[in-house]
Design a protein with these regions (language model features):
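Aromatic-rich, lipid-facing transmembrane alpha helices and their immediate juxtamembrane interface loops
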Residues: 2-409
Length: 409
């Protein structure tokens, strides 16, 4: 051997291998995009400052000017940081520094996801989301392929994991965390089926609650997606609970209860705020809730997006979830036939993605119709024909639409 293959400071044969031309072209585009974004961000920031100084910001930013300004500033800072990282990322690709480029791709993925959320809250759904969405797809692909050593490590780990999964299935431990630190293995397969099952179970539980507590004997469709019996807030909530509480399942029940209460209430507040600022939609409000005969302080503090009683329900739900329901759900998930488990996951992932995208688009065009700003384009006409206001009001019976509550610019 003419060099030490185990020395991390010495590049391996795969790391010395040249970057493909198509990736180099993309690297140049990243650098140009980053360089071009910085002056654009500075110019936009100056426009915002000028509008605030001249006092005409309210006309451009709408009724919720403070929230809009906060989101705009956050978006500007995010865009500036992303531009700088994008330049460095492009240079690393050109210089064949694959491992550094792979690390930066993870940061850019996180920044791009947040950028998408901010754009939706400020402008709704539109073609302007294509650029960050395409960039997100490219970054995800590059993060898995740009560093050959990481790709080889993942392939070896995948093959080893298949062998371990088969052994675990024989021992009745499939899906469990082999380290013993958590209960369930936090992989995409397990978390996706937790999400899907809880979307359905959460909707059933909410319907029962509404018929027995909120409005006895009256059925109301509480679905949260355009198609199917799904309420995604419960699906995402269950995934979040599973990821956070996974290592708490052996802890004191009081600790699990408190962590679940804080986590669930915070999640409920964020989802309510996001839907209201993005689409002017309010699906629930606890502003009327009382605590010992006085206005619930948590409801007052969060603008009615959660309350003390439901925070306690989140706490109790998290405790029941991690102690009783998750183990049984894991057994149910493992009943999916071995040969079809991954193909079934891919098929249902695509179905849920299509449903999710169409749900967001239908909400966006519903908002625009109520606001009187619907564009005269084919996609708007499609949603206006098949998912008009009457359809949306009947489908999302728990939602109220108020465009003035949104932060659209």
């Amino acid at each position: 051997m003419d060099r030490n293959e185990l020395d991390p400071s010495v590049p391996s044969a795969t790391e010395v291998k040249k970057i493909p031309l198509i990736i180099k072209v993309y690297a140049v585009l990243c650098i140009l995009s980053g360089v071009g974004t910085l002056p654009s961000v500075a110019a936009f920031m100056w426009q915002v400052i000028t509008a605030l100084i001249n006092g005409n910001a309210a006309e451009k930013l709408g009724d919720n000017m403070l929230v809009s300004v906060g989101l705009i500033v956050a978006g500007i800072m995010l865009s500036a940081a992303s531009a700088v990282i994008l330049i460095i990322f492009g240079l690393d690709l050109i210089k064949n520094q694959r491992r550094n480029a792979a690390r930066l791709s993870y940061i850019l993925i996180a920044f791009t996801v947040v950028e998408l959320l901010v754009d939706v809250m400020l402008q709704g759904i539109g073609l302007f989301l294509l650029r960050p969405a395409i960039q997100l797809g490219i970054l995800i692909a590059l993060s898995a392929t740009v560093d050959p050593t990481l790709r080889q490590e993942r392939e070896l780990q995948r093959r080893l994991q298949e062998m371990l999964d088969r052994d675990a299935a024989d021992e009745g431990m499939l899906g469990r965390d082999e380290t013993g630190e958590g209960y369930i293995k936090l992989n995409y397969f397990n978390l996706f089926w937790v999400f899907l099952v809880c979307c359905v179970l959460g909707l059933i539980a909410e319907d029962i609650w509404h018929m027995t507590v909120d409005d006895p004997g009256v059925y109301q469709d509480r679905a949260g997606m355009l198609f199917g019996p799904f309420s995604p807030i419960y699906g995402f909530g269950a995934v979040l609970m599973t990821m956070v509480l996974n290592r708490f399942y052996k802890k004191n029940p009081i600790i699990i209860f408190l962590v679940s209460a804080v986590l669930g209430a915070s999640f409920e507040v964020f989802v309510g705020w996001f839907m209201q600022t993005s689409f002017g939609v309010v699906s629930w409000s606890y502003s009327h809730m009382k605590l010992f005969g006085m206005p619930d302080p948590l409801a007052v503090l969060t603008g009615g997006r959660t309350c003390t009683g439901f925070a306690c329900l989140w706490g109790l739900g998290g405790l029941i979830w991690i102690k009783l329901l998750l183990p049984r759900l894991l057994k149910l998930i493992n009943m999916i036939p071995w040969k079809s488990r991954y193909s079934a996951t891919v098929i249902f992932t695509v179905i849920m993605l299509v449903d999710g995208v169409m749900t967001l688009q239908s909400l966006d065009y519903w908002y625009q119709r109520v606001n009187g700003t619907e564009p005269d384009i084919p996609v708007a006409q499609f949603y206006g024909k098949y998912f008009d206001n009457d359809y949306m009001e009947n489908r999302f019976q728990s939602m109220t639409m108020s465009p003035k509550d949104a932060t659209r610019v």
